[in-house]
Amino acid sequence: RVVTAIGDSIAAGYGLDSQEDNYLTLFSDNIGAVLNNDAVSGYDSGEVLKSLSDEKTAADIKNADAIVVSVGGNDFFHRKDIMIDALKNALLHGEGFFPEEVTNIYDEYEKNLSRIIDEIKNMNPDAYIIVQTVYNPFLKQTLNFSYINVGKTANRYVTRLNDSIKNVCKTKNRVFVFDVAPE
C-alpha cells in the first residue's frame, strides 16, 4: 500500500521535532503503507494545484492507493490584510458578516480544491482521495478585541472553509472528508 500526501504545513509536519511524529507517518505505519509526503509548508490551494505538475509529485500520485490532501488555511493566512479588515467589519456589522473580498477567497479556494481533486482523479482514477478539514488555531484563545472574541470570530471563517471542503467533496466519487475540526 502507498499513501501520498500533498498540501501545506499540516501535512508536511511543520514544527515537529521529527517526521516520525507526523500524523501521516503514524497513519501510514499503522496500516503498513509506504508514505510519499509531497506537502510543502506555506502552500495555499493555488500552489498545491501547480505542484501536481511536479514530476515527483505526479509519479507519487499515479502510484498511490490513497492521496491525502491538506490545504486551505494558507489561502486565508496569506491574506492577513483582508482578514484583519474582516475582523474590523465584524466589529461594525456583526460577527456573521463576510466581506466580498473574503467571499472571493472562498470561491477561489473551492475552484482550486475541485481542480486539485479532478486532476488527481485524472492521474489515478482508482485511488481514494482523503481531504482533511482545517482546524482553528485560535479557537481556545481568549483574546477579545473590543466586543469581538477573536477565536470565536475566526471559527466562523474556519467553519465556512470546512463547509466549502465538505461541499466540494460530496460532489466527487471516492473522495472522503477527514474532519479534524472539533465541534
Segments (PLM) and residue ranges:
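Hydrophobic, aromatic-enriched interface-forming segments
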Residues: 107, 112-150
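Short, solvent-exposed loop/turn and secondary-structure capping segments
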Residues: 14-18, 79-82, 142-143
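Oxyanion-hole/transition-state-stabilizing segment in secreted/luminal serine hydrolases
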Residues: 47-106, 136-137
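Serine-esterase "nucleophile elbow" of acetyl-processing enzymes
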Residues: 1-41, 57-59
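Substrate-gating cap/lid alpha-helix
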Residues: 139-180
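Structural recognition of the beta-strand scaffold that forms the well-ordered cores
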Residues: 2-7, 35-39, 65-70, 128-133, ...
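Solvent-exposed loop/turn segments at secondary-structure junctions
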Residues: 9-12, 40-46, 73-78, 135-139, ...
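Extracytoplasmic/secreted envelope proteins and their assembly/folding machinery
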Residues: 24, 28, 49, 106, ...
